[in-house]
Amino acid sequence: MEVLGKQKVLAMMKLNGAGQLTGYPFETPSSSTTTPSVPPSFPHSSNPNAYMKPSPPSAISSPPSTSSCSSASEKKECAVCKNPNSSGYHFGCIACAACSAFFRRTVVLSRRYYCRRDPVGNSLCPLDRRHRSNCRACRYVRCIDMGMNPSSVQNLRDSIKPRSPAEMIQEAEEEDKKEKLDDILFSAATPGSWISSTSTCNEPLPVAPKEIPGENYIETLAALYKNSVERRRMFYCNGSLREMLGGTGLKMRPTRFDERYYKEKMRFELVLYVEMMNSMSVFRQMDLDTKETLVKGCAVSLAMLEKYYISVKYDGLRTQKLIAPDGSYTDLSDHGAQFDDEFTQITESVMDKETCLKLLYDPLRSCLNELGSALEHSRMTDTEFCALFAILLFNTAADNLSDASRNAVVMARNRVMKDWFEFYAKQGIDPHEAGLLVGNTLLLLTAVRNAMAVHRENFHVIRVFNVMEYDKLIDDLAFT
């Protein structure tokens, strides 16, 4: 056993009336299990603490007595996670077995963590008995702040023969799984826990998705969205082969009254969105139920957002034209003049033109002015659209998500935020300006939600009064 300095020994242990060492065990960089011997008595002095440095809470603070002996046997809470059942001093501070094992694994395996809540590195995540496994980066920072010393950790401690890196990693993963299971069982019986009280051991443990080195979600989405625009141009091109191959831009044309919900158009657009979602490894790794829940909750919102984004991009806010991805537009400034011929040809219309315009098109004008103005003010580009695409996809408030799936969605959204800032940094954008761009983009969510409510009411009128035929797939997208 390594001989510790006199001041450190007294700061970590207590002396009872008989001169025997009592209190909490402490770890030293040694594999020896022998009981430490009683240190030699110190010279008498009128002030026994004169040569001592300030001590931690367990240091000598009063003359030995019966009460002090009884308090020495009481448990102290872990300095890291506030677990009341600490196991003593570990690597320099009072800690529980779980936190000391976590610290040892981190140092031995040379692990590096980052906080998904704050990529800058500030420790913002809650750290207590229930949430200590949520963010390893903040947990390790807390360990260091509380006094744990990485140099006190010995590699291959208590090992008879050298272990391979694969064996060490496997052992660490098993310990992580046991700790998470212990946290789940604790949280199931604790009020206010983020885990449902109905959680059982059979429920899948929340695990961090496997990450591909160098993958940036925003960069991937932006590249794929650019390809999707080109695919749309070729798919919706009604011209010659030369026009299709020549890269002619988006052609504007007035839309038909009943064209908005064509079957072929809706399914093609949904395929493009799913391709963008599958480009992110975190989405591909999710189970089918989670994917279905997330897509149902965001598909219509994404289609609506992109329509207004395209409208602003092609000056639709000034001309009061709502432009679809295929180039068809609805002129909201002519009071439905573009549909005069269609209304005259309909012999058994369920409602007259004035009523139809009042219920269906006047609300769209309000949405264009509100959401379109917000998009223009935020200076949205393809980058911000793709970032908002991912934010809407990874909706942590989505219904019918299990605890494990919801935790994976939270980690995915935090990863999106991190990659968003990193993408701006690669482009040489100042961090302050990047923060403004991110903040202004996130503020659009309120306008998106308001516009979505109007479109939902709009479609409800169409469905109830059978104003036009629509693809029944939309009923499966949580739009009704």
From Swiss-Prot:
BP GO terms, sorted: cell differentiation; positive regulation of fatty acid beta-oxidation by octopamine signaling pathway; positive regulation of fatty acid beta-oxidation by serotonin receptor signaling pathway; positive regulation of transcription by RNA polymerase II; regulation of transcription by RNA polymerase II
SMART domains: HOLI (SM00430), ZnF_C4 (SM00399)
Tissue: Expressed in the intestine.
A GO term, aspect molecular function: nuclear receptor activity
Compositionally biased intervals (Low complexity): 25-36
The protein's name: Nuclear hormone receptor family member nhr-76
Transmembrane segments: none
Phylogenetic classification of the source organism: Eukaryota, Metazoa, Ecdysozoa, Nematoda, Chromadorea
Gene Ontology CC terms, in alphabetical order: nucleus
SUPFAM superfamilies linked: Glucocorticoid receptor-like (DNA-binding domain) (SSF57716), Nuclear receptor ligand-binding domain (SSF48508)
Gene name as annotated: nhr-76
Superkingdom field: Eukaryota
Coiled-coil ranges (or none): none
Regions recorded as binding DNA: 75-155
Coarse class of the protein's main subcellular location: nucleus
Localization per record: Nucleus
